Amino acid sequence: MKCPYCGYPDSKVIDSRPTDDNTSIRRRRECLKCGKRFTTYEKVEQLPILVIKKDNRREVYDRDKILKGMIKACEKRPVPIKVLEEITDEIDKRIINSMEREITSTEIGEMVMEKLKNVDEVAYVRFASVYRQFKDINTFMDELKKLLKESETKKENA
């Protein structure tokens, strides 16, 4: 492994261990020339997952799009970025663990809305308004009424 400090092409492995989630191997290495230490990760190469868009185009799955969409929906809301990163991790694991090579953007959007609804209702409505592309104010109001009804039911059951 090439040293990131001096560029020497050889190093020795000092320590190897699995990461906490057991999806990769963390290796501590030492450069044979300059002696500096660095860390590398070894991971199984995954086949790309394709997202089937609403117009039937296909594009490579990008977990960052999920995070960016939620960040946009949560602008000026009291939702910590850490929460959004955790949601992104959960959705990402769910998609990867499904072992499917294709997933629809609709399925991903529904997963995001399911999570956002429990975190911040305003962010949920913002995300839903873009994702569901409401045709008019009435369909938007129907979604709000449904959300209010669910919210009231939760309060009654609490």
UniProtKB/Swiss-Prot annotation:
Zinc finger (unnamed) in chain: 3-34
Cofactor list: Zn(2+)
Keyword terms of this UniProt record: ATP-binding, DNA-binding, Metal-binding, Nucleotide-binding, Repressor, Transcription, Transcription regulation, Zinc, Zinc-finger
Organism: Thermoanaerobacter sp. (strain X514)
UniProt superkingdom: Bacteria
InterPro entries reported for this sequence: ATP-cone_dom, NrdR-like_N, RNR_NrdR-like
Protein name: Transcriptional repressor NrdR
UniProt GO BP: negative regulation of DNA-templated transcription
Cited NCBIfam families: transcriptional regulator NrdR
Family: Belongs to the NrdR family.
Free-text remark on how the cofactor is bound: Binds 1 zinc ion.
Every ATP-cone domain range: 49-139
